[in-house]
């Protein structure tokens, strides 16, 4: 059975990505208020369009240049929640920059996600 061209499995994946991004955003805000992070710009409300955009990227051949609110987009491209937390907390295992880049400036060499600068 399909809904607007999407299978039940595809819709569950989309919902899971949107939900994960929202919960990640909420947790990052809590950590910021606890003094465990130093910068956060929320992405809540942007998730659906970011997931839709991410699903139309050819992973492995297309390059992406996300801006600071595109957390759901990066999740859709294959970044994990753990990798996004490593970036947010500026940890050495952060795939974006080994903890040297400003948080919310996503990058991932293996996924062709190019980090921005500010």
Where are the language model's segments positioned?
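Cofactor-/ligand-binding subdomain signature composed of acidic, glycine-rich
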Residues: 1-39
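Cofactor-binding active-site loop characterized by glycine-rich and histidine/acidic residues
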Residues: 23-118
